[in-house]
Amino acid sequence: MEKRPYSVEWLSESSQRKAVYSNADLLGYKSGNPDKESNISLPSRATGPTLPSVDYREKENYCVRNVQNEERSPPVKDQLHSQPAPQELDTSRRALMVVPACERSTDQGNKVTGTTDTNKKAKPVCDEDAAARARTKFSPEQLEELERSFKENRYIGSSEKRRLSKVLKLSETQIKTWFQNRRMKFKRQTQDARVDAFFSGLYVPYYGYPDLPTPGYSVQPEFSVLAPHTMAAPSLPFGPLQSTVISPGLHPTAIPSANLGSYPYSSMLVHPMLNEPKRQRYSPY
C-alpha cells in the first residue's frame, strides 16, 4: 500500500486493519504533510505501547466518525437553501384548503338531495322560523270583529278566543298576539293623550285680570261667577245653575267687587277656554 496524503478512505482502511498510531502521528496525517508521513514508524504489538491499545482504537474511531459526519452533513448555507420557499408553503396551504372546500360541496349536494338525516331535521326548523316571521294580514271584517271584542274586554278569555278562532278562521295564537299588540297600542294612545292634554293648557292655572285690559282686547270678566237672581238670564239649552262657581285658589272674600250689570250676558259661566282665540296663551315649548 502506497503512502498518500491524509484522506477518509485511508483512515477507514487503516481502522479495518487495526493499526495503532500515536496522537502525534494522527496530527501529522491530519495536517497533510508528506514529509512527516514518510518518517512515521508504526509501533509493533510485541514491544507493547505505553498506553493500552483499546484507548488508541477508541480515539482513532472517534476521529474517523467526526470526519465522516462533517463530510456527510451539508453546510449551513446548503441547509438554508434547502428550506422550503414561501411559494411552496403557499401551495401546500392551498392544497390543504381544497379539502374543506370539497367537503362543503359534498355537504351542499347532500342538502339538495336530502340524503343525510341531519339535513332532513334542519329543514322543518327553517320552515317554522320562516312561518313565525311572516306577518299575518287581517281582512277588514276580521279587524272589525276583533275591535268589537277588544272594546268589550281588553283581556280575552279562552272561550272568546275559541269563538273568534272559529268565526274568523284564525288560530288562537294569532288572536292572542293581536290582543297583546292592541293593548300596547291602547296604552301608548292613552299616554300620548294625557301628555297632550297637560301641555294644551287644560291643567295649567289660568287667571285673568279685568282691571288691566290689553290693547285690542275687550274687557270681560274672567272669574266664573253667577249673576244675581234679579237679572234675566238668556235662554240656554240647559237649566239654570243654583250654585256659585269660584276659581280654585281664591277665597270668596278675595273676589273683587265688580259691577256685573255693566257686562252683557253676565249670568253665563265664563270659562277661560272660551276666550282662547282672543288672547295668546302661554305655551311651555
Swiss-Prot record:
<dbReference type="GO" id="GO:0005634">
    <property type="term" value="C:nucleus"/>
</dbReference>
<dbReference type="GO" id="GO:0006357">
    <property type="term" value="P:regulation of transcription by RNA polymerase II"/>
</dbReference>
<dbReference type="GO" id="GO:0045892">
    <property type="term" value="P:negative regulation of DNA-templated transcription"/>
</dbReference>
<keyword id="KW-0238">DNA-binding</keyword>
<feature type="DNA-binding region" description="Homeobox">
    <location>
        <begin position="131"/>
        <end position="190"/>
    </location>
</feature>
<dbReference type="GO" id="GO:0000978">
    <property type="term" value="F:RNA polymerase II cis-regulatory region sequence-specific DNA binding"/>
</dbReference>
<dbReference type="GO" id="GO:0000981">
    <property type="term" value="F:DNA-binding transcription factor activity, RNA polymerase II-specific"/>
</dbReference>
<dbReference type="GO" id="GO:0030509">
    <property type="term" value="P:BMP signaling pathway"/>
</dbReference>
<feature type="region of interest" description="Disordered">
    <location>
        <begin position="69"/>
        <end position="88"/>
    </location>
</feature>
<keyword id="KW-0805">Transcription regulation</keyword>
<keyword id="KW-0804">Transcription</keyword>
<comment type="function">
    <text>Transcriptional repressor. Acts in a ventral signaling pathway downstream of bmp4 to antagonize the Spemann organizer and ventrally pattern the embryonic mesoderm. Represses transcription of the dorsal genes gsc and otx2.</text>
</comment>
<keyword id="KW-0217">Developmental protein</keyword>
<dbReference type="Pfam" id="PF00046">
    <property type="entry name" value="Homeodomain"/>
</dbReference>
<dbReference type="InterPro" id="IPR001356">
    <property type="entry name" value="HD"/>
</dbReference>
<feature type="region of interest" description="Disordered">
    <location>
        <begin position="30"/>
        <end position="54"/>
    </location>
</feature>
<protein>
    <recommendedName>
        <fullName>Homeobox protein vex1</fullName>
    </recommendedName>
</protein>
<keyword id="KW-0539">Nucleus</keyword>
<keyword id="KW-0371">Homeobox</keyword>
<dbReference type="InterPro" id="IPR020479">
    <property type="entry name" value="HD_metazoa"/>
</dbReference>
<dbReference type="InterPro" id="IPR050848">
    <property type="entry name" value="Homeobox_TF"/>
</dbReference>
<dbReference type="GO" id="GO:0048264">
    <property type="term" value="P:determination of ventral identity"/>
</dbReference>
<dbReference type="InterPro" id="IPR017970">
    <property type="entry name" value="Homeobox_CS"/>
</dbReference>
<dbReference type="GO" id="GO:0030154">
    <property type="term" value="P:cell differentiation"/>
</dbReference>
<dbReference type="InterPro" id="IPR009057">
    <property type="entry name" value="Homeodomain-like_sf"/>
</dbReference>
<feature type="compositionally biased region" description="Basic and acidic residues">
    <location>
        <begin position="69"/>
        <end position="80"/>
    </location>
</feature>
<dbReference type="GO" id="GO:0000122">
    <property type="term" value="P:negative regulation of transcription by RNA polymerase II"/>
</dbReference>
